[in-house]
Curated annotation (Swiss-Prot):
It comes from Saccharomyces cerevisiae (strain ATCC 204508 / S288c) (Baker's yeast). Mg(2+) binds at D630, D695. The gene is TY4B-P. Residues 48-112 form a coiled coil. Residues 619-786 form the Integrase catalytic domain. GO terms for biological process: DNA integration; DNA recombination; proteolysis; transposition. This is Transposon Ty4-P Gag-Pol polyprotein. Proteolytically processed into capsid protein (CA), Ty4 protease (PR), integrase (IN) and reverse transcriptase/ribonuclease H (RT) proteins. Initially, virus-like particles (VLPs) are composed of the structural unprocessed proteins Gag and Gag-Pol, and also contain the host initiator methionine tRNA (tRNA(i)-Met) which serves as a primer for minus-strand DNA synthesis, and a dimer of genomic Ty RNA. Processing of the polyproteins occurs within the particle and proceeds by an ordered pathway, called maturation.
Amino acid sequence: MATPVRDETRNVIDDNISARIQSKVKTNDTVRQTPSSLRKVSIKDEQVKQYQRNLNRFKTILNGLKAEEEKLSETDDIQMLAEKLLKLGETIDKVENRIVDLVEKIQLLETNENNNILHEHIDATGTYYLFDTLTSTNKRFYPKDCVFDYRTNNVENIPILLNNFKKFIKKYQFDDVFENDIIEIDPRENEILCKIIKEGLGESLDIMNTNTTDIFRIIDGLKNKYRSLHGRDVRIRAWEKVLVDTTCRNSALLMNKLQKLVLMEKWIFSKCCQDCPNLKDYLQEAIMGTLHESLRNSVKQRLYNIPHNVGINHEEFLINTVIETVIDLSPIADDQIENSCMYCKSVFHCSINCKKKPNRELRPDSTNFSKTYYLQGAQRQQQLKSSAKEQKSWNKTQKKSNKVYNSKKLVIIDTGSGVNITNDKTLLHNYEDSNRSTRFFGIGKNSSVSVKGYGYIKIKNGHNNTDNKCLLTYYVPEEESTIISCYDLAKKTKMVLSRKYTRLGNKIIKIKTKIVNGVIHVKMNELIERPSDDSKINAIKPTSSPGFKLNKRSITLEDAHKRMGHTGIQQIENSIKHNHYEESLDLIKEPNEFWCQTCKISKATKRNHYTGSMNNHSTDHEPGSSWCMDIFGPVSSSNADTKRYMLIMVDNNTRYCMTSTHFNKNAETILAQIRKNIQYVETQFDRKVREINSDRGTEFTNDQIEEYFISKGIHHILTSTQDHAANGRAERYIRTIVTDATTLLRQSNLRVKFWEYAVTSATNIRNCLEHKSTGKLPLKAISRQPVTVRLMSFLPFGEKGIIWNHNHKKLKPSGLPSIILCKDPNSYGYKFFIPSKNKIVTSDNYTIPNYTMDGRVRNTQNIYKSHQFSSHNDNEEDQIETVTNLCEALENYEDDNKPITRLEDLFTEEELSQIDSNAKYPSPSNNLEGDLDYVFSDVEESGDYDVESELSTTNTSISTDKNKILSNKDFNSELASTEISISEIDKKGLINTSHIDEDKYDEKVHRIPSIIQEKLVGSKNTIKINDENRISDRIRSKNIGSILNTGLSRCVDITDESITNKDESMHNAKPELIQEQFNKTNHETSFPKEGSIGTKCKIPKYRQ
């Protein structure tokens, strides 16, 4: 018996073989069902029998192997069966090859029996047709690969259709049916060509019988249809409609127009112009007739100088030459703009009576050349005589008008030449004779002139002629007048001709022109400045008296240095060496280097910082190992809760920047932020900080920071005193970040207290922009792991947006208008400012409208200053002043020793003693940043809806569940949730609970600046200060904090993670000591009533 493993192996191999057999049988069946096998083709019986015999033999071998496999015993090895199965696979491959050969033989029989019928065939490439040409047999035509992609429904495009069809025939090696020598082609080829050209014709184009199957008749029918609609007069008008000048700078449109005219003549030339010259000369005259007189000479000169390209037709070469000439001459006319004509609505002035055609009388031959070619016999002779009379009369009128001008006082402006020549030597400045036998040639080879010399002609280019330009000009006595190149004139002086060639000039000067015999002239005295007689000045060389001569004298370098007032040694040596003094001096140098102690002391300077020295230093360190840091501030602001300082750290290698804003710059704050930044770099970027550069500020040179750097093994490099350039990278980045933040605040019309969010946004953007020194993104360069950055993930700072309100009520809008600030580093969302609630929240459910609107209507209304939150001092001047203060802080941020008002200036000695006694007790609001005094109440909860009950129900969330442990952040959030204001609530009426959604109350609570609040909140005794106006006056006089008012003046950032513990002693103290200290303060304290600072409050216990 066979084992389970052997049975499984046998079944798998058997199934694979059966699948291959069935797939091959299906393939053979599909081959039999192809269109070629369904044709009436006789197949020999022997070939069919051979196919069946091979198939039966294969099945017999397969059945024999299966029977032999079943007879194998359990001890037999299965290797023998695998070898036999391998041989069976080889047999299957042989049978497949024979099947393919048989199919090819059947197809060959079909083609031999039906040579005159077009059949479809299929191979690995696709469907194809077989046909014979005059030069080859059995050519294959694949319709998918050989596509004729031109379609037309217009009779006007028949020449283009025939031209593309001729290129298609030549490309795919069909017989050229357009040749007169070819009369008959293969019927299969004829059927293919008829099918292709009929696909190119539109359905609405009725030019012939649709049942026509002869390609020659189809082509003749297309030509006859086109000739019947385009007679001699039609073609003459088509040529006369086109006028090409230097304003036709659209090369694609110009080439399309001229090629269409050329094709029109090529397909009907042999039938209509039998007595005319050959097609080549006729088309050349026709194309030259479309050119303006100012352009024709330049084209002729280019055709004469440039050899003809053998690879293209003569007409294509001529059209390309015209286009190149127009392109070369068009930049000269800077004041000309290519527009459609206002009369004929065309770029080429295609109307015969167009008023904008410049100088129509200048093209007498171009308007009549087609008529003279087409007219025959007496009519042609009569037309020639009439045109000659018109030419003579036109010449007479020109001669009469030319008598007024004197050729010696005129200058010719040549638009087709690049060389300036003159016959008047007196016009040339700095003239020099030419020793070489230089000769210039015109259009003809026999019209050469010799050059005798060269100089410069000064062109008047201003009212006072103070900015004259010089043109290199050759002196040719044989020339009749002075010729100035229009191209050279425009290049040097930017003087160009107007559209109608009536003026020559630029923005400063304009000169009238006169066209004489088709040549542009200007007056010489208006264009050229003649050289004056006293232009050369001979300088008088000073000489000493012949009777007096000074003897040579020796002098030491030290003596000369003292005599010349302690000036530079090198200047003294050069002055004596070059004999600038009358006496002859011999300078004696000391063997040792000269040293002047007086100069060294008096002229001492700072050390020079060479350009790129810091870059060379940064390349020696790996990314993230070397940093430079500095502090910016203080930022002047009337708001006490505005952060005033910014710490910046920049990587010297990758230019990655890290910024943070703070209320102060003491050692504890700066050290905590540096420690946080270093830990972030080591954890997120997998980099090791080894070196930090900073200045000698007290915030960087204290013992705490030095101890931390020593513990981390970081090398702290300090700059020299007052050597700010040594820390120039941090200084430069401070300027970059602050100017970016100032720009964002200015364009968004936000207050200066939002500058910390603008700094965060600017820092994130700078880290994701390529730096010009490294050529990389700083974020990608510093990270050891690959980082992906998306541009669309950045939102525009200060723009309007809509965020989802998760606290919205039913039948109320679920969106809140907000202002985009910056990315939240502690979440995947963005920070938004909600003006209606005066809050800053983080959300990733937002919608941004189209902010790419017109800048003139953006930010026309300051929505951030609503009537609810604005004070009487808020206006546009205050906004400008806040941004100005930030800019002034940038300029003067190095001056950190600004006078700070002390508490002694605000309070009396009795009040200060009370503040000092309260300072020893820890305050639960030490972790709070701002100028709000958070109020608590211990009023019992009642059922009446009055003010007292509302206060008690609101504060129950603080006193409930005393067994829970609250962190500093949770405690602060509870304190923030208890902020109340009762200025707008009617105490006599009921309070609707729907107005308490945001945990805000309306109560007249007076605000205390944060400087005083840190000492007051959590105090044991109440400071009894009844004169509120006196405190306000004292604060105003010292410019500290903001004016005490009764309105809400603070924006609470409920997502700000920067609320840190300001009292580290409180943070590090034991829970038992903290509880003991709070138990001492756990009793009611009487604050002044409404109208004075504070209110009745009770400090809750610290929960363990």
